[in-house]
């Protein structure tokens, strides 16, 4: 198995183990995580090819941040999560699978945040598009963009926002 595939597998196994006691996500099997979480992120890997810094906020159990950090070891990732048990898990997972390009913060992103600037800001299933952008736009480089993962039931109008790449996940 390739190194990246081994890291993803180790991440999923650790996630399932922690999930039994920490209730990190709804999924309870490896296949559910692959079908409902990992497959959402895979189509967008190429969006990151020119980035040097990425903020993933509201990362939950580490998706998409951990997966993107595995795929792009030369990009520096900051993964921010406001729920302590989830931030602890993400930090533990990053150490467990040997991600040297990842910094995990237990923090809430707001208009007063002083992180960054970042080439790309991502989040998945966190708040509204308007709230996401309003809370973090000051953290984005001038040439950067938001990559928001929203389900089919969520409507994003990218024309309404500068620096937004909207992608519908299955």
Regions found by a protein language model. Name each.
Residues 151-161:
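Conserved class I S-adenosyl-L-methionine
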Residues 133-142:
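A short glycine-rich, Lys/Arg-flanked "PGG" loop and its adjoining helix->strand segment in the class I
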Residues 144-151:
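Conserved beta-strand signature within the Rossmann-like core of class I S-adenosyl-L-methionine
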Residues 163-170:
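Single conserved hydrophobic/aromatic residue that forms the stacking wall/gate
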Residues 1-50, 96-97:
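Class I SAM-dependent transferase core
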Residues 42-117, 123:
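Conserved SAM/SAH cofactor-binding pocket of Class I
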Residues 120-130:
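A short SAM/SAH-binding and catalytic strip from SAM-dependent methyltransferases
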Residues 75, 143-144:
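A short helix->loop->beta-strand "cap" motif at the edges of active sites that frequently abuts
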């Amino acid at each position: 198995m390739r190194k990246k595939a081994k890291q993803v597998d180790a991440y999923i196994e650790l996630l399932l183990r922690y999930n039994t006691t920490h209730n990190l996500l709804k999924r309870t099997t490896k296949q559910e995580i692959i079908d409902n979480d990992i497959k959402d992120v895979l189509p967008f890997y190429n969006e990151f090819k020119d980035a040097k810094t990425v903020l993933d906020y509201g990362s939950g159990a580490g998706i998409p941040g951990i997966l993107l950090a595995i795929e792009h070891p030369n990009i520096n990732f900051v993964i921010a999560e406001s729920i302590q048990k989830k931030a602890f898990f993400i930090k533990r997972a990053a150490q467990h699978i040997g991600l040297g390009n990842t910094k995990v913060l237990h923090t809430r992103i707001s208009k007063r945040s002083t992180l960054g600037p970042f080439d790309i800001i991502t989040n998945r299933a966190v708040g509204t598009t308007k709230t996401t952008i309003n809370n973090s736009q000051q953290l984005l480089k001038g040439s950067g963009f938001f990559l928001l993962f929203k389900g089919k039931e969520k409507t994003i109008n990218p024309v309404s926002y500068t620096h937004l790449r909207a992608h519908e996940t299955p």
